[in-house]
Swiss-Prot record:
Keyword Repeat set for record: yes
Keyword Ligase: no
Name the UniProt record assigns to this protein: F-box/FBD/LRR-repeat protein At1g13780
InterPro entries linked: F-box-like_dom_sf, F-box_AtFBL13-like, F-box_dom, FBD, FBL13/AtMIF1-like, LRR_dom_sf, LRR_FXL15/At3g58940/PEG3-like
Domain called F-box: residue spans: 9-55
Signal sequence, start to end: none
LRR repeats, residue ranges: 197-220, 243-266, 302-325, 355-379
Domain FBD: 372-424
Organism: Arabidopsis thaliana
Entry-linked Pfam families: F-box, FBD, LRR_At5g56370
Keywords per UniProt: Leucine-rich repeat, Repeat
Length: 456
């Protein structure tokens, strides 16, 4: 029997106001304000929402007059001023707003759980006509907020409060924050005051010589890709992480001249896109002994990892390093996803030799932009004999000699291989699937039960 809905029947309005407020909390404040026109009951419901999510571009600024925005925030904070707030999110990447940090401080004092502030504002110097960031330092009560669970700051200033204690903070995302000029406030001091911190995403400030993270609670750490690189770095920068509970780490691009890892004994997964040198298109000098020692110590420090994702940049760096140093064994590693440049396929056996217990391999090949030199895959890594069960070769464009050579290398040498997957970016132009199957089935498979799968 089909159910019918009475015309004009509003199920949402029948919900309790407390539940409606929680629903509106997940919308931008601009959207929740619009609900005030629905009916008399909805007129002030948005003021009961336990949080703000504002973009200052939604307010009409005239002659740098920020009064409308400030009045809006003040009205919201004063309404039910004894109730707790759950979230305060604001993007004021437009003009500097006088005493805006006071409003942030008011929100913090209301027991917020989520603080998300982006303050990417600039001023133009009249003398040199260069744009400089306007730094809005966070209020001091931020550093002792007992309710804060998630903190995200972009282009904000952090000064030394003397003491940091954020007992509930689990998630922290800092994007190019500015530390005060005293030199006593830094990432290490901030993290040390977060006893239950689990996730840290950090895009650094170019002015710090050493950036250090020490945490026993930290489980996930990421340095994301940075779209704008500084062309005028004044100092050589070192990054150091000491986190015995860390399970996941992602390093996406070379923001630091030197990386030091310590006590990463719980590391499960790592995602690497680094070359161990700062500079677009640069590669490190294999004759640089301190750099070789740094790479050796880094690889040894992450060698307990179980799952690795590795970019073509890092593969190139490892190939360079392998000519002058020994890549350590990753005895716990069972899964690897590697983007492999076609020009470095000769390095593939030595690369896989470092993973003696590898079970799953996803190999993304890159189409050669020029005629490749002949290469031979001769040496058989240890994992081929006893552990390698699943191989996927991705990024295939057409079926050629190089692709056949890679596929036959795995089929003819892997003793326990269960599945070989060939993933094409489209349909091969010059071969049908049946042609490829026929060619591969002529090979002598070392593992007779290996299944070949073609994906187009």
């Amino acid at each position: 029997m089909e159910s019918t809905v009475m015309p004009g029947f509003d199920r949402i309005s029948e919900l309790p106001e407390s539940l409606i407020s929680q629903i509106l909390l997940h919308l931008p404040t601009k959207a929740s304000v619009k609900t005030s026109v629905l009916s008399t009951r909805w007129k002030n419901l948005w003021l009961n929402v336990p949080g703000l999510d504002l973009n200052c571009r939604d307010f009409p600024f005239q002659n740098n007059n920020e009064k409308l925005l400030i009045d809006f925030i003040d009205r919201f904070l004063q309404f039910n001023n004894e109730s707790r707030l759950q979230k305060f999110k604001v993007d004021y990447s437009r003009d500097k707003i006088i005493k805006f940090s006071d409003r942030i401080g008011d929100a913090i004092s209301r027991g917020i759980r989520v603080l998300d502030v982006e303050s990417n504002t600039y001023y133009r110097d009249a003398d040199d006509c260069i744009d400089y960031p306007c730094i809005e330092f966070m209020p001091l009560n931020l550093y002792s907020c007992k309710t804060l669970v998630s903190l995200k700051l972009s282009y904000s200033g952090l000064e030394d409060p003397g003491f940091v204690y954020l007992p509930c903070l689990k998630f922290m995302h800092l994007r190019e924050v500015r530390w005060d000029s005293s030199g006593t406030m830094n990432l290490e001091k901030l993290v040390s005051g977060c006893p239950v911190l689990e996730e840290l995403i950090y895009l650094h400030d170019d002015k710090l010589v050493v950036t250090r993270v020490r945490s026993r609670s930290l489980k996930r750490f990421s340095i994301p890709f940075r779209h704008k690189l500084s062309l005028f770095r004044r100092v050589t920068q070192t990054f150091e992480i000491d986190a015995p509970g860390l399970e996941y780490m992602s390093l996406k691009a070379d923001h630091f001249d030197r990386i030091v890892v310590k006590n990463l004994t719980s590391l499960f997964m790592i995602d690497l896109d680094i070359k161990f040198i700062v500079g677009f298109g640069w590669m490190f000098d294999p004759e640089d002994l301190p750099k070789r020692n740094e790479i050796r110590d880094f690889l040894t420090g992450i060698s307990s990892v179980r799952h690795m994702v590795i970019s073509h940049n890092t593969v190139k760096a490892l190939d360079l390093y392998s000519k002058v140093g020994l890549i350590p064994k990753f005895n716990n590693l069972s899964r690897v996803e590697a983007a492999f440049p076609s020009s470095l396929l000769q390095f593939l056996p030595a690369f896989l030799e470092s993973f003696p217990n590898l079970k799953h391999l996803i190999l993304e090949t890159e189409c050669p932009v020029e005629v490749m030199e002949k290469f031979e895959l001769v040496n058989v890594p240890r994992c081929f004999v006893s552990t390698l069960e699943h191989v996927e070769i991705k990024g295939l464009f057409d079926w050629g000699e190089q692709d056949m050579k890679i596929a036959s290398y795995f089929l003819e040498n892997s003793a326990v291989l269960k599945k070989l997957i060939l993933s094409f970016m489209g349909c091969p132009q010059h071969y049908s699937e049946s042609d490829i199957y026929e060619e591969l089935n002529k090979l002598t498979k070392r593992s007779p039960r290996c299944q070949i799968i073609i994906r187009c």
